[in-house]
């Protein structure tokens, strides 16, 4: 399945999947690879993301089931998985759409910056595997 997915994206879109470490920070690693060509910048991406969410509490808190301050504190910790809330924040803070490919040549999900006029920037493209891992 994984090899077929990689071949499909290469053949139909010209994309190559770059594998990132599966250590709980894979989403942030994949974004760091897309933004900085360095997955080791994942800690900086995480920090910027959580700072942005904290500054925009009123916007993000309704999408978080637990106490928002506790959520942000927990998500700041290395190894905590990122999710759709963090992807939306990253899209907004970098003013770039984020396309998520999951075993298809077309994105399964796309996150857009809040100000749609800013989504002219090149998308961040991530692949999602086995319901728990992101690659670049």
List where the protein language model places each region.
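Deubiquitinase catalytic domains
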Residues: 84-136
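Structured beta-strand/turn binding interfaces of compact recognition modules in eukaryotic regulators
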Residues: 20-23, 29, 55, 63, ...
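Non-catalytic, low-structured ubiquitin/UBL-interacting segments
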Residues: 1-19
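Second-shell loop/turn segments in exported
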Residues: 16-17, 34-36, 75-76
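Surface-exposed beta-strand-to-loop junctions
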Residues: 5-11, 24-30, 63-72
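Active-site nucleophilic cysteine motif
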Residues: 22-32, 80-90
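Intrinsically disordered, low-complexity regions enriched in proline, serine, glycine
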Residues: 29-30, 38-44, 61-62, 99-103, ...
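Interface signal in eukaryotic adaptor modules for cytoskeleton, membrane trafficking
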Residues: 38-82
